Amino acid sequence: MNIFRFAGDLSHVFAIIILLLKIWKTRSCAGISGKSQILFAVVYLTRYLDLFTTYVSLYNSVMKVLFLATSGATVYLMYVKFKATYDHNHDSFRIEFLLVPCALLSLVINHEFTVMEVLWTFSIYLESVAILPQLFLVSRTGEAESITSHYLFALGSYRALYLLNWVYRYMVESHYDLIAIFAGVVQTVLYCDFFYLYITKVLKGKKLQLPA
């Protein structure tokens, strides 16, 4: 495993920790898109169905369990334990507009037309756009709390580092995956405007605001 993938995984785990601590400490999920969290849960469920059938390494298995458990915990906290604090009115993105195209695309463009491979491909496509409801929520409310901004930055950094991981693997191993690379580019592009605002505002102690 190369340093870029490891750093990306750490950034991903850090983002999850920030999110869960934010919800638990404030006893509120205000400012967090439950729809994005549902999409991420679907991503992990469809990607890691091979958890009990395919063993790669202890590290790989631990990360799979971690992402499945934390995504489930996040959805539980938002829709059950702290349901009263969830902003239903602003979190109004139509996620079927993401789910259906990703499902259709995974049936048409995949590495192999098998159930597991199609589901894996679906998870890759869906992850690339799963953050859209969160960005839409921030845009509708007009601003994001600093802790939410840190969460989004860590999540975006994870994907950017994974792109570097693919560059490294191509240069060192002559290995590449066009589906993963394309989805990673799409996801990173979605974060670009946020990255700019994060660096120019949040790091200077100002509130992050996205254009409506």
UniProtKB/Swiss-Prot annotation:
Cell location: Endoplasmic reticulum membrane
Main location: endoplasmic reticulum
Cytoplasmic side, ranges: 22-35, 81-96, 138-149, 200-212
One function term, GO molecular function aspect: KDEL sequence binding
Topology in membrane: Multi-pass membrane protein
Stretches in topological domain Lumenal: 1-2, 54-61, 111-117, 169-178
One GO cellular component, as annotated: endoplasmic reticulum
Keywords: Endoplasmic reticulum, ER-Golgi transport, Membrane, Protein transport, Receptor, Transmembrane, Transmembrane helix, Transport
Pfam families assigned: ER_lumen_recept
Transmembrane annotation, as ranges: 3-21, 36-53, 62-80, 97-110, 118-137, 150-168, 179-199
Entry superkingdom: Eukaryota
GO aspect biological process, one term: vesicle-mediated transport
Task performed by this protein: Required for the retention of luminal endoplasmic reticulum proteins. Determines the specificity of the luminal ER protein retention system. Also required for normal vesicular traffic through the Golgi.
Listed PANTHER family: ER LUMEN PROTEIN RETAINING RECEPTOR
Entry's family note: Belongs to the ERD2 family.
Record protein name field: ER lumen protein-retaining receptor
Organism encoding this protein: Drosophila melanogaster
Taxon lineage: Eukaryota, Metazoa, Ecdysozoa, Arthropoda, Hexapoda
